[in-house]
A protein has these predicted regions:
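Conserved catalytic cysteine-centered active-site region
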Residues: 2-55, 89-96, 151-171
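N-terminal extracellular/periplasmic Venus flytrap/periplasmic-binding protein-like
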Residues: 111-171
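Glycine-rich nucleotide phosphate-binding loop and flanking beta-alpha elements
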Residues: 6, 65-67, 123
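Short, well-ordered secondary-structure micro-motifs
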Residues: 9-10, 69-71, 144-145, 152
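Active-site-proximal alpha-helical scaffold in enzymes
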Residues: 32-63, 102-129
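A short beta-alpha structural unit
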Residues: 1-3, 141-142
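Short glycine-/small-residue-rich flexible loop motifs, especially phosphate/cofactor-binding loops
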Residues: 15, 99, 124
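Flexible glycine-/small-residue-enriched beta->alpha junction loops
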Residues: 47, 51-101
Length: 171
C-alpha cells in the first residue's frame, strides 16, 4: 500500500520491492492506492485471493513514508474536473473523517482521550511483554514501536490543540 507514489516510492513500488528483494522474477508485485487505507486494502486483496484459491502466500504492507512527500505536493497531476469541483468532500483526510465520525456518533473529546490513553497503556504493556516481537521487523536497530507513549496522561492530552476543526474534538 502506498498512497503518494513519489520519489523512491513511485513507479509501482510493490513490483520494485519483489524485484529488489531478489525474489524470483516471476513473483508479481502491485501497488495499491486507497489513501489512508492502502496497506489494509492490500491485506484484504491478498486474503480474498487466498480465499478464492488464486494464491497461497502474499507479502503485504505499507511502504509509504510521508517525509518523502514534499510539502505542497499535489496528488492530482491534472486540473480538477467540474465534477470534482462540485464534490469537495470527495477526498477527505483521515482527520476530517475522524471529526465527522465523532460528530455523527456524539463521541466527545474526553471519550476520545480516554480511549487513546487506554490504547497507549495496552500497547505499552504488550510491548513490555514482548508481544510485538514477531510483528516488527528490525531495521537499523529499531526493534520497537517508538510511537507508543507510556507516559501519556489526561492532562497532557487535554493540552493538545485541535488539529482539524477549531470547533471540533480531534487533536
Amino acid at each position: 500500500g502506498c498512497a503518494f507514489q513519489v520519489g523512491e516510492q513511485c513507479f509501482n513500488i510493490g513490483r520494485l520491492v519483489t524485484f529488489l528483494s531478489d525474489l524470483d522474477i516471476r513473483v508479481p508485485g502491485m501497488t495499491v492506492d486507497r489513501w489512508c487505507g492502502s496497506s489494509m486494502e492490500a491485506i484484504h486483496i491478498a486474503a480474498g485471493k487466498i480465499a478464492m484459491g488464486s494464491g497461497k502466500a502474499f507479502i503485504c504492507g505499507g511502504v509509504e513514508s510521508m517525509t518523502r512527500v514534499k510539502t505542497g505536493f499535489d496528488p492530482l497531476p491534472y486540473p480538477y474536473s467540474d465534477k470534482e469541483k462540485q464534490n469537495p468532500n470527495l477526498y477527505l483526510s483521515m482527520g476530517i473523517t475522524a471529526e465527522n465520525v465523532a460528530k455523527k456518533y456524539n463521541i466527545s473529546r474526553t471519550e476520545q482521550q480516554e480511549f487513546a490513553l487506554e490504547s497507549h497503556r495496552k500497547a505499552n504493556e504488550a510491548q513490555q511483554k514482548e508481544k510485538f516481537v514477531g510483528e516488527i521487523t528490525k531495521i537499523d536497530n529499531c526493534e520497537t514501536d517508538e510511537n507508543i507513549r507510556p507516559n501519556s496522561t489526561m492532562e497532557k492530552l487535554d493540552s493538545l490543540k485541535l488539529a482539524f476543526d477549531q470547533n471540533g474534538t480531534v487533536t
